Every structure is written in C-alpha cells, then in structure tokens.
Amino acid sequence: MFIQNASSYLPVLALDPKPNEEILDACAAPGGKSSFIASLTLNKAKLWLNDGIKSRLEGILQLKELLNFEYEVLTNFPVQRIDKEINKTFDKILLDVQCSGEGMMDISKPSTMKYWSLERTQKYMYLQQKALNATFKLLKPGGVLVYSTCTYAPEENEMPISNFLKHNLDATIEPLTLNLKNVRQGEKSFGNFTFDPRLQGALRVLPSDGMEGFFVCRIRKKVSNETYEGVKLGED
C-alpha cells in the first residue's frame, strides 16, 4: 500500500484520458496513476503499462488486485528504448519519468536529501531526454504525451523538453492552467540557457499542504492544418 500525493493526480488530469483510447503509461509502477486513468475512463481505456524496473512490477499487480482496475498489457522495457520494443502507436502516453525527486525533499528530514547530487540530476537529464524521444515515436499523429516529474530542477524539466522541441518540429506544447496559489508556469530560462517560450505553458507545483513539488507538461504531436487548445485542470 502507498499514499498518493495530490500532485500526482495532475499528470493524469493533464492527459485527459477517454474511454476506448489506447494509452501507454511508460513508467507505470507502482500503479497509482494507471489506476486513476482506469477510474476516469470507467475501466474502458485500452491500457498498456510498462516499467523499466522489474522489481517494481509487483506493486502494479498488487494494486490491480486491490482496486480491481483493468489493463491489457504489462511489460518491463527500458523506457529509453521502448520504441524498439513496442510495435504500435498510442492515442495518449503518460511519461512520469524517473527523476531526482527534489519535490519530495523536506529540509526538516535530512534523510530525504541523502541521495541528491548535481551529478545525479545531470544523469537523469540525459535519461529523460532519451525517454522523451523514444516515447514520442510511439505517439499517433494528433496524440498527446504528458511529461511529468516530482522535481524542481530545470535540468530535468524545461531543459530536456526544450532540446526535444528543437529536433521534433511536429511537437508542440498545449498550455495547462490550474488556479492554485502554489502553481507557477514553466521557467523562461536557467543560467545561460533560454528555453523554448512555449514551455511557459507547463505547470510547476510548489510544495504546500497536501501537495509535493511537481512539474507537468502536455505535448501534442501535430497534424497539419489542425489547431488545439490547452487544458484547465480541476474544471469540467
């Protein structure tokens, strides 16, 4: 069992899953977001769950038994090369990628910062960039990919997405809005690096009562001559 922080629901709300859609949760363990997708779609989404760490799959199986939510496929592929393993495309993809976890740190609890280092952040940035490139290849034209982390680091959020946008001209960001005082838009720059201005449509959640730090960005694979709107979270 685990308690899911309120911030963890935001990536799924940004994904806006619908019944009968083919949806990939690329880093699914322990299954909290997957079960929320199933709940919002009344167990009618065609869910493919994947996690690159085999030992974490057991958590998904246990949660499925507890909550009785449905999925079609469960796999154990490294997300950085998942496009080489899955021979199909999806309407929507959730990429809640592994990160340094800065959003869960508590200065009153030094143990939460035990494993943090700048080198670790830079390592994750490289892996996140590869994961984003790989999963986007599995997205249908017109489809939506939501990228999320539980860290503040621009190196793991705006930076890999900004680099990704330079090399994927068929990708665009759809603005997200959430009317909470602890929510900010994406950063414009970091150090000497200026981000793609569209990243101001991403959301940064600052820690507050009941909410950990989080980053959420909604990416669309464009189809010619079509226009798309952003998403207001927490509203019908």
Model-derived features with residue positions:
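S-adenosylmethionine
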Residues: 1-236
